């Protein structure tokens, strides 16, 4: 075992002494050393319930014959960090998390890891670490929050009843009392936000990849089932160490294709494109951006999930969960191994039935194509991403007039001030991985568009990204980004922009010669942040089309 490096032999006397200083008995010294990487914090609802899950994981490890050690990993809530300086830090924490897990596991020669996670960037960061280390690992996602409840059985959801509610209030659609009800009811307790936002999408994809146990991706945070899954995961990691089953044997090209198909079938968050590309990079799997679009054209959307649809995570869980989606996709799914020991098709076959009002059959899809589309054109020669499952039919093709902003803050002020009108295309740039830095989510502007009633008359394009809670004609991940000299930097107010999602096209209607002339006189702006972690991050991060990974160069 890897831990023999610190427990065996005369030369390791000091190491054993230090371990015994933690209370480790001599009788446990030869057991598999299991690290439990916990992202517990009582600052955010998605992670506040993890103390209980830690206990169950620990019990499982010891029942399985291992010895566990806890170590902490930071967790950032995208909702709390949204709309201010804090959002610059969200995506970069993904890299910090991967590096921290790698550092602790390698420094202490741990034999295996249980990765306890939940919110947006923590789960992909943990998976990146697992793929990079390639030692036995299993992921436990802490689970989704229940929907909020109000008068007459009304259901509340965090994004639609807070961010969008602000704009509805500003427009006079709701009053003080209703706004207060939204605030009180939107987040009723522990768990990740209730709809198919980034955290829940990543939990589902983790299960689909085979890196967490069945039902882990959808079981509610408050459920007894989640605690049983935590226990079973702790027990299972010891078996994985003994059998030397490692993440790269699970996260194959075929497994990534399965994850993409499930993502497309559910209409998941566009952030998953960034994260799957980054995880695949760490796993040594070639996964071009175009793969998402190729699979989208042959994978129909089978569910209508909040925020763009009617169903919540609690509905998806009882309808069949991930296994139900796999079952409905049938032969479109590869038969891949999972950490459970069963293959994907065996897991799907074990499910007796599926609630087809929630997870439709292939013969009766919600939409003919999957939820994510990849666009190209003279604005985005290396690609852009749109969550087409959240776009109304009338906005799938749109031509409008550019209204350009060099930051999210300026765009938000213009929207709330009534400057943006129907027929505009809002261009938000210098918000990419380098330019932001940190590729902030544009949830506040997109929620403002919907709340102001402009979702069917205004499009938004950006080199930033969007929340999993975003809906409407919002195109993100434009690459190359403005700070890297991408063409989005050369768009001017008044330009005509043509969006054609069915044709996978996004263009500014000016000639190549005009764009070349604008490029020649373009001067890169000074970095927004010149010291600290974000300044270092901006120097080594790539554009969105490669997953916004960091490089050694």
Curated annotation (Swiss-Prot):
[2Fe-2S] cluster binds at residues 119, 193. It comes from Geobacter sp. (strain M21). The active site is at 467 (proton acceptor). Belongs to the IlvD/Edd family. The keyword Lipid metabolism does not apply. Its cofactor is [2Fe-2S] cluster; Mg(2+). It holds the Pfam family ILVD_EDD_N. InterPro entries: Dihydro-acid_dehy_C, DihydroxyA_deHydtase, DiOHA_6PGluconate_deHydtase_CS, ILV_EDD_C, ILV_EDD_N, IlvD/EDD_N. Pathway: Amino-acid biosynthesis; L-isoleucine biosynthesis; L-isoleucine from 2-oxobutanoate: step 3/4; Amino-acid biosynthesis; L-valine biosynthesis; L-valine from pyruvate: step 3/4. Keywords: 2Fe-2S, Amino-acid biosynthesis, Branched-chain amino acid biosynthesis, Iron, Iron-sulfur, Lyase, Magnesium, Metal-binding. PANTHER family: D-XYLONATE DEHYDRATASE (PTHR43661), D-XYLONATE DEHYDRATASE YAGF-RELATED (PTHR43661:SF3). Its EC number is 4.2.1.9. One of its GO terms (molecular function) is 2 iron, 2 sulfur cluster binding. It is an enzyme of class 4 (lyase). The keyword Secreted does not apply. Mg(2+) binds at residues 78, 120-121, 441. GO terms for biological process: isoleucine biosynthetic process; L-valine biosynthetic process. Homodimer. This is Dihydroxy-acid dehydratase. It comes from the Bacteria. Binds 1 [2Fe-2S] cluster per subunit. This cluster acts as a Lewis acid cofactor. The modification N6-carboxylysine is found at residue 121.
